[in-house]
């Protein structure tokens, strides 16, 4: 999110939401982010921050929607793809999570992406069913 004189209040709300997420207060972050989401729903950084807050507050479907929106706006965002994979995994949608985590790791081979992909593969190999029972 970029700061413009007319949007300084929104920028401050965005920064406050970032700080609240860093302090493990995702619900407060979502409250601070509300006006920014209303005003700038097509800003990938705003959607990404909302997705992180939703994920950290176990609002998994809303997190999924936010990360999908980020990827609609910026398909090259490897972190959004990684976070989408984590949201899908937490919903028990392992095959979908695997596809997203695999793409994130291919886009940027960060250790945390590789580790998450490895852990998911172990879970899938152990036969833990996804939400469809497969």
Where are these predicted regions, by residue range?
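Alpha-helical segment of the N-proximal tetratricopeptide repeat
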Residues: 7-39
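Structural signature of tandem alpha-helical TPR/SEL1-like repeats
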Residues: 23-31, 35, 57-69, 91-103, ...
